[in-house]
Amino acid sequence: MNSKLLRSLMVLHGDTNASLAAYLGITENSVSNKINERGTEFKQREISKIMRRYDLSAEQVREIFFA
């Protein structure tokens, strides 16, 4: 996971862990843990929502979540 790239997109779009968590329907702690690779990974449903929120291409999704 490329957490730096995801965090840069969050900043670019004015998101915080809290706002992204609310959008995804998960806790802020869960977002933090997933970004920092502590435990669980983002689920497919969450990745799809992030893709739509930030208007990401399939290549960008691969760079962020499958690097």
What spans do the regions from the language model cover?
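DNA major-groove recognition helix of helix-turn-helix/homeodomain DNA-binding modules
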Residues: 45-60
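Short alpha-helical "recognition helix" segments of helix-turn-helix
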Residues: 19-21, 50
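Short amphipathic recognition helices of helix-turn-helix/homeodomain-type DNA-binding modules
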Residues: 60-67
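DNA-binding alpha-helical recognition surfaces that contact promoter or target DNA
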Residues: 8, 22, 33, 63
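DNA major-groove recognition helix of helix-turn-helix
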Residues: 35-36, 46, 65
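A short, Lys/Arg-rich alpha-helix, primarily the initiator
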Residues: 1-15, 23
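Recognition helix of helix-turn-helix/homeodomain-like DNA-binding domains
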Residues: 26-41
